[in-house]
Amino acid sequence: AASPIEGLLERIDKGASRKFMIEQVKSPVDFFELDQKGDKVVIRGNNYVSIATGLNWYLKYHVGIHLFWNGMQAELPEVLPAVKQKERHETDMKYRYDFNYCTFSYTMAFWDWARWEKEIDWMALHGINLPLAMVGVDGVWYNVLSKLGYTKEEINDFVAGPGFQAWWLMNNLEGWGSP
């Protein structure tokens, strides 16, 4: 795909990217616009997250399609409903945050790329631009504790496993009882 939005459109419905024009423009505020050029719906925004949010808005309020975690694919109509009047939406919220330590340690610790890609798509469609990403924190701890003279066994006894990292990072537990 030529842009992340075209890739997102193709994951939603194969061939859908041909029905849209994506335009990225400079702006000091996050915004998206919906417009029409001939038979193509134009989604314009200042970054890819804003544009993805505009796509979600268009699908919901112009096409009647609601994407959700377990249903990130939809069959778009052969001819998309036209945007009759240009519309613009802005936000004054610079950061739109997602996740907390606990949600990251439930099943997310074991997700593969396909599952993460769906989550990243969902976040972009909903305007999320600051997801918690604590990936690799355990590596930092291993490095620091090693430099402080702890043995590998002591470090392994202290650092929690992937499904327990949230509680470990919040100081609620130490180590984990794996075989």
Q: What is each of the regions a protein language model found here?
A:
Residues 2-39:
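N-terminal-proximal low-complexity accessory segments that begin disordered
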Residues 27, 37-179:
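Feature activates predominantly on carbohydrate-active enzymes
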